[in-house]
Amino acid sequence: IILYMIDFNQFPSPCYIMEEELLRKNLCLIKNVADRAGVEIILAFKSFAMWRSFPIFREYIDHSTASSVYEARLALEEFGSKAHTYSPAYTEQDFPEIMRCSSHITFNSMQQFERFLSDGGGRRK
């Protein structure tokens, strides 16, 4: 166990403090597991969206998830890759931007798929 003596009074409050060395150690472990298992790890913005750390994450993880148009845009513009997007509900207004910012889109139902992507015969609009 590594213990650090940090004077937390030196930081403004509230703020987030990230220890880069430990983050990299954990990301290295995650990447090693993914490589050995032959899988891709996807960063979920719901649990972690500290966008200033995205350059570090990009060294270890290639993709992210999004559950809104804003997260999809964050994935493309700040993380640097299109998102794997899932949302229980999409709007006609947001869907073109979701498509622009996403590499994968998961629908909640066949009705939702047909509403946004199908011409009614299962073919893409």
For every predicted segment, state its role.
Residues 3-18:
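Generic N-terminal amphipathic, Lys/Arg-enriched alpha-helix
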